[in-house]
């Protein structure tokens, strides 16, 4: 058998082979830079994704959902709708709260979006109610970056109002000052206030009204500038006792005189220190608490930030009263640490397996040491580049490095194997290194750039998924590029110094046995290849069959978006009858908490009741269930959810919706389940007609579970139907009626108490303890034009009606969100298709539109772009290979290996019961870059044999296949073993890593078996095609 002639120049490696000291120092510099970079990199669960979302919250205590919509939400929406770069605007108007969520284009800087939002709020100020307690407040919201830590502050002795004040002025501020902390938000609604509860009978007996009391309080408590005196010799600042600070001072306030005797506020009202909003509450386990959610600054190291918070907690606790306790309810870094540690372990295991497979093939310790140095050097050097690119150590970048283990060793293996071949033939190590490195240099460059070309389309994905995987793709590309540099510099230099004929020929019993085994395998392969080359059309039919099979598998495989992770935290929504009060809901919440805390997997529970920026109505409650670490519980999160829902089903009058929290969260609003589908109309009446019909259909679908809707139109309303004629005769306006009702039942904030540390409100309301329900309306009194007191019942009738508990808009039109989960035996793709089919059967009118939201919308977008992404990767690789080979034909031969990888990956996913999700698709794209390596190594040597030895194409490709069989097998097994730890992972975050490993292992196994035989056949086929084309052109030229 003829041997391919090596190059004698050494190519780009010559300088580094001849200067070992310089090469060594260069590699040491790369190593040190990587170590320094590793220590400087922040740690997070996923790459930093700037999601330009701003939330505008406006509180108007006492306002109904209808009033909030028309008076607050609509004016703001009209202004926001004129902003450039706005992608979507959604709003939720409920009792006393308006929440508008503005989602901007990913390309718009968040600072610019903030400026536009502030300008829009300023423009809408004159259109908002004049008695709005506070202007709209906006805040940056990043759904992809949830709180890193949740703390609960409880006390066995202090009132919760004092605890809230202490937390707001002392604890939260201290935590906010920690480096890396971005925002600290409080839940629990126990801000201190002076509450004035009017006795309706007492003020009526004295001929007073609530408006009289409100005016008196407002005028008695002011805080304004008074000026100063500037005399000839001294200046004096003016001050006065215009502020009342305590409930006792308010009790003594004179609100009127009767028969010359003063009437004090304490005579007609109960004045006490209380909470600003008595319809808000938070609980930690079974204790009422103030809950703090801590979010990090963008780019901050989540691990060091959490450690700093924990280090400060003992110091903070010592400064608080002994009865106050600060408890860590949840800490995301616990799971992040575990996930990152598991991924780092899998990375080390991949390195160990790759080195083991190298030794198995080379059977030589010096030859094994060389790639054993090249692999960690390439990976560690990548950290230095990651620092300059502002990347982080996260699950995706570590996955990229784990996969890169199998990639980066390929280059070193190819170089070592080629150099070793020349040494075994009798060449001196230095000469062999020069010849072997020079001969293989173009192959290394081809392998490197064609593999990087596969990753290029990932960089141009414009959606949130593209932003997420940008770090993955660049990290992998950098590792591959450094690997190529190391393989062309350090590897041949070490081969020249460490390898020799004696070391390569030195064999033990294992070496001799394995050598014979490999010789038999190569001989068997040679015989099989000869038979395949004699029956090319049969082999070609097999190749075409794999292409057809890959298309069929792609169509029928279950499809998903992102693997459901077990992060140890469950979000829940508790739903009660629509007429439930705060007290009733709080009681139900405590019953549910008792049931949940009995589960052996639950560590702690946080719950919240009341209307605020995230909770839409009094009949719902938010829950956060913190599970024990994965190693301390028997079941994963999905089984725990099923068990908890079964247990809570026994609690009457409530529905519980649970979903595991995810590292990747795209939804901009609090949802009951993982996936959302919206129904939008031009009016609420249209929604009330079609939502029940669609819900009935969807609840019958086996592809969906936990189907629910935020459409709640059975909220009780006491409609005050005023006889306007009668009211007019008495000189009573509708504004007087509204003011009287607001004073009595709106928890009206009528004044502000200013202190050195904080500001507190004075709250006015009627004392309804003795007159609960609708009977309280009979106590309302108004003042007529002649000063008389008129009962509300004399000019109005009270009608009980139903109305929505909240009014939701999407881009200024009414909308309803239908939430759903997907059962274990179905995929998200099945659910989406079932919903779309059901929608068609309803024949919805043209004024009703439907759309998926959040993760489901992202799934549709990712699914639609996946095919184009793969096509782009193939085209990019064809262009690079065409440029490198200066040929239109050879790149097609190389790319013919791709269908085999697709078949293997899709079959492996189906056998493992995994969906074709974003992670698996990334694995398939990487396979495109890996499997073509086999063809490149074959074709490079075949072309060289034809060019330099004058061999026929059949002899050249046959010899190339036999010569490159061992490095092909080594590189494929190295890539396979690099992905194997990901496929077998079982720890925290394994759900994210496993699909990538499964797809890559399956694709590599199938492609390895098939491409060793199909590639030579296709090479010869295209060679004949090229000859036929040339002969045709030659004939045409002769005829011309």
UniProtKB/Swiss-Prot annotation:
Is Transport tagged as a keyword? yes
Which InterPro entries does its entry note? AcrB_DN_DC_subdom, Acrflvin-R, Multidrug-R_MdtB
> Where is it localised?
Cell inner membrane
Alphabetical keyword list = Cell inner membrane, Cell membrane, Membrane, Transmembrane, Transmembrane helix, Transport
- Bridged cysteine pairs (disulfide): none
**How does this protein sit in the membrane?**
Multi-pass membrane protein
Q: Which Pfam families match?
A: ACR_tran
Q: From the record, give the transmembrane residue ranges.
A: 16-36, 347-367, 369-389, 396-416, 440-460, 472-492, 537-557, 863-883, 888-908, 911-931, 968-988, 998-1018
Entries under SUPFAM superfamilies matching the protein: Multidrug efflux transporter AcrB pore domain, PN1, PN2, PC1 and PC2 subdomains, Multidrug efflux transporter AcrB TolC docking domain, DN and DC subdomains, Multidrug efflux transporter AcrB transmembrane domain
Induction per UniProt is:
The mdtABC operon is transcriptionally activated by BaeR.
Any one GO CC term of the record: plasma membrane
The UniProt record lists the keyword NADP: no
At the top level, the lineage of the source is Bacteria
The protein's GO terms of the molecular function aspect are: xenobiotic transmembrane transporter activity
What the protein does comes down to: The MdtABC tripartite complex confers resistance against novobiocin and deoxycholate.
Q: Which protein family is it in? A: Belongs to the resistance-nodulation-cell division (RND) (TC 2.A.6) family. MdtB subfamily.
Subunit and partners? Part of a tripartite efflux system composed of MdtA, MdtB and MdtC. MdtB forms a heteromultimer with MdtC.
Q: What is this protein called?
A: Multidrug resistance protein MdtB
- State the organism named in the record: Escherichia coli (strain 55989 / EAEC)
């Amino acid at each position: 058998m003829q041997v391919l002639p090596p190059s004698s120049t050494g190519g780009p490696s010559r300088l580094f082979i001849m200067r070992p000291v310089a090469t060594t120092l260069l590699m040491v510099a790369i190593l040190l830079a990587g170590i320094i970079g590793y220590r400087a990199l922040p740690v997070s669960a996923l790459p930093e994704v700037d999601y330009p979302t701003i939330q505008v919250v406006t509180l108007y205590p006492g306002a109904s959902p209808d009033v909030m919509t028309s008076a607050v939400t609509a004016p703001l929406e009209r202004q926001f709708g004129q902003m450039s770069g706005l992608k979507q605007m959604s709003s939720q108007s409920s009792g006393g709260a308006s929440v508008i969520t503005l989602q901007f284009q990913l390309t718009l800087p968040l600072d610019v979006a903030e400026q536009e939002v502030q300008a829009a709020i300023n423009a809408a100020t004159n259109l908002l109610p004049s008695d709005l307690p506070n202007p709209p407040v906006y805040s940056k919201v990043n759904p992809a970056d949830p709180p890193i830590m949740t703390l609960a502050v409880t006390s066995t002795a202090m009132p919760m109002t004092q605890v809230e004040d202490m937390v707001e002025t002392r604890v939260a501020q201290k935590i906010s000052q920690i480096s890396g902390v971005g925002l600290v938000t409080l839940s629990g609604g126990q801000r201190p206030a002076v509450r004035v509860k009017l006795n309706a009978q007492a003020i009526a007996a004295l001929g007073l009204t609530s408006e009289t009391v409100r005016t008196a309080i407002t005028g008695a408590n002011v805080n304004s500038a008074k000026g100063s005196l500037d005399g000839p010799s001294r200046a004096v600042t003016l001050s006065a006792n215009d502020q009342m600070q305590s409930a006792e001072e308010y009790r003594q306030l004179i609100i009127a005189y009767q028969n010359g005797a003063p009437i004090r506020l304490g005579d007609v009202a109960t004045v006490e220190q209380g909470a600003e909003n008595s319809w808000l509450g938070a609980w930690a386990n079974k204790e009422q608490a103030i809950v703090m959610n801590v979010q990090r600054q963008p780019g901050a190291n989540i691990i060091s930030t959490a450690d700093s918070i924990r280090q400060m907690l003992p110091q903070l606790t010592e400064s608080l009263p002994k009865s106050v306790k600060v408890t860590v309810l949840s800490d995301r870094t616990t799971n992040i640490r575990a996930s990152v540690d598991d991924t780092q372990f899998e990375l080390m295991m991949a390195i160990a397996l790759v080195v083991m497979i190298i030794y198995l093939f080379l059977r030589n310790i010096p030859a094994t040491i060389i790639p054993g140095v090249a692999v960690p050097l390439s990976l560690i050097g990548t950290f230095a580049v990651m620092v300059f690119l502002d990347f982080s150590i996260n699950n995706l970048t570590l996955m990229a490095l784990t996969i890169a283990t199998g990639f980066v060793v390929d280059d070193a293996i190819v170089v070592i194997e080629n150099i070793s071949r020349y040494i075994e033939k009798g060449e001196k190590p230095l000469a062999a290194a020069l010849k072997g490195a020079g001969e293989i240099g173009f192959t290394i460059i081809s392998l490197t750039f064609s593999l990087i070309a596969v990753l290029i389309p990932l960089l141009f994905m414009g959606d949130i998924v593209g932003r997420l995987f940008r770090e993955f793709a660049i990290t992998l590309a950098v590792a591959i590029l450094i690997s190529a540099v190391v393989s062309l510099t350090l590897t041949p230099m070490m081969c020249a110094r460490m390898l020799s004929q004696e070391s390569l020929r030195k064999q033990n019993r294992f070496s001799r046995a394995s050598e014979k085994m490999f010789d038999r395998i190569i001989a068997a392969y040679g015989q099989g290849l000869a038979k395949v080359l004699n029956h090319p059309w049969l082999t070609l039919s097999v190749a075409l069959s794999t292409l057809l099979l890959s298309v069929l598998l792609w169509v029928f495989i279950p499809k998903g978006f992102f693997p459901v992770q077990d992060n140890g935290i469950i979000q829940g929504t508790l739903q009660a009858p629509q007429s439930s009060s705060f007290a009733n809901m709080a009681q139900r919440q405590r019953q549910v908490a008792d049931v949940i805390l009995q589960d052996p997997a639950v560590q702690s529970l946080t719950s919240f009741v009341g209307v605020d920026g995230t909770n839409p109505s009094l009949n719902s409650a938010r829950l956060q269930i913190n599970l024990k670490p994965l190693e301390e519980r028997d079941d994963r999160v999905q089984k725990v959810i099923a068990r908890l829902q079964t247990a809570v089903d026994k609690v009457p009058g409530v529905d519980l919706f649970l979903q595991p929290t995810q590292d990747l969260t795209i939804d901009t609003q609090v949802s009951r389940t993982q996936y959302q589908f919206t129904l939008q109309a031009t009016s609420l009446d249209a929604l009330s007609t079609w939502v029940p019909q669609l819900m009935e259909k969807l609840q019958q679908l086996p592809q969906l579970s936990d189907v629910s809707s935020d459409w709640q139109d059975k909220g009780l309303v006491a409609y005050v139907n005023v006889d306007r004629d009668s009211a007019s005769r008495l000189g009573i306006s509708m504004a007087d009626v509204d003011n009287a009702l607001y004073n009595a039942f709106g928890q009206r904030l009528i004044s502000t108490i200013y202190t050195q540390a904080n500001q507190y409100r004075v709250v006015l309301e009627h004392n309804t303890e003795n007159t609960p329900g609708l009977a309280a309306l009979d106590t309302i009194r108004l003042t007529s034009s002649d000063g008389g007191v008129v009962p509300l019942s004399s000019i109005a009738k009270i009608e009980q009606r139903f109305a929505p508990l909240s009014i939701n808009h999407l881009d200024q039109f009414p909308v309803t969100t239908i939430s759903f989960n997907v059962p274990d035996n179905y995929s998200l793709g099945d659910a989406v298709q079932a919903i779309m089919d059901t929608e068609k059967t309803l024949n919805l009118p043209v004024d009703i539109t439907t759309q998926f939201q959040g993760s489901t919308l992202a799934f549709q977008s990712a699914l639609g772009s996946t095919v184009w992404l793969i096509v782009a990767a193939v085209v990019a690789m064809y262009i690079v290979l065409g440029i490198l080979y200066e040929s239109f034909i050879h790149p097609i031969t190389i790319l013919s290996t791709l269908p085999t990888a697709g078949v293997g990956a899709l079959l492996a996913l189906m056998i493992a019961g995994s969906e074709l999700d974003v992670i698996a698709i990334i694995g398939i794209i990487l396979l495109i870059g890996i499997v073509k390596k086999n063809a490149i190594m074959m074709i490079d040597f075949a072309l060289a044999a034809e060019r330099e030895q004058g061999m026929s194409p059949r002899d050249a490709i046959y010899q190339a296949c036999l010569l490159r069989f061992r490095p092909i097998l080594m590189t494929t097994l190295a890539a396979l073993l690099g992905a194997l730890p990901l496929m077998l992972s079982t720890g925290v975050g394994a759900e994210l890593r496993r699909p990538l490993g499964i797809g890559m292992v399956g694709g590599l196994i199938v492609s390895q078996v098939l491409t060793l035989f199909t590639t030579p056949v296709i090479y010869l086929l295209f060679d004949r095609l090229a000859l036929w084309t040339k002969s045709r052109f030659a004939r045409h030229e002769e005829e011309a």
